[in-house]
Structures are given as C-alpha cells and as structure tokens.
Amino acid sequence: MRVIFILFLYLPYFIFSQNETDYNITINTGEAWDANIFYKKTGTPLRPVIILNSSGEELFHEVWPMQGNDFKINDNNKITFYDLETDGWMVMDSLHNIVDSVYCLNGYVADPHDFIALENGHYIMFAYDQQPYAMDTIVEGGDPEAIVEGLIIQELDADHNLVFEWKSWDHFH
C-alpha cells in the first residue's frame, strides 16, 4: 500500500516534468543558416529554453518557469531574455551567468517582447502606459471613458541612468 501511495504522490512530477523536445529537422542542406538557434516554446507543461547548433544538436536545454521570453543573442554579443517574475531583462555571458538585470525607470514596466542591448553598453526597452482618453473627441460614438495604451521607449546607459525617453502621449495632445 505504501508503494502505491508513493507512486501516486510522485506520478504528477514524472508526468509534468518531462520536457522532451518536440521538433524534427526535415531538411538541412549546405545553404541552411550556419549558426545557433535560440528559442523558448511557451505553454503548459513548462518547456525549456534551448540553443541548437545548425545540425540540430542541443547545446543548452534548461527549464526556466517564468523566464526566457525573447531568448536571443543581442547586439552586445550577450544572451538576453525577459524575466516575468521581476518584469525585467536579464543579460547573460557566454557561460550562462547572469551579469546584469535591466528594468524600466519612472514607474514603467518593461514589455517582454523586445529588448536591445547595444554594443556601447546601453539598453533600449519598451513599456506601455494606459491612460483614460475621451475617444468621443476623436471618433463619433467613441467611448468618453476609454482606456488607451500609449508607448514608452527608454534608453539606459551601462550604469542604468536614463539617457532618453520618448512617450507617445506627448504627441496626442
């Protein structure tokens, strides 16, 4: 009876911890891209971030439950990805050590879809800013109490000082 109990106790772990890769390379000719491929497939069950070489061999495979969006080599030749737990961007060296973390300033939350780490050490991030806006002043029948999303672009230097900020709202009024 104890063995059955232990089996049922650990069964979900064995079922949901499987992170088998689910891809097939069907064509790989000499004209194919000859570089590593970085990706993370999202969804349930949790899937790993993966680096594949051009032959399809896994070079890196690790499950990061709340991290890994936009997993790529950036312009500064470092690996970057978004962390959903902290709402910021992580920067890794070639040994997969986190060497920096970057967040939007002035109360904004970085968007998880794109991040530019420049060669000069600067970072560019995007954020959204929701504001009430009387859309009935723009279009006939518009909602006078609409919530409209504006865009924020921030550039931070290597010390995370704000050196540039653009707000789409500055161009609405």
Give the positions of each predicted feature.
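Bacterial Sec-dependent N-terminal signal peptides
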Residues: M1-E20
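Histidine-/acidic-rich catalytic cores in large beta-rich domains
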Residues: Q18-H173
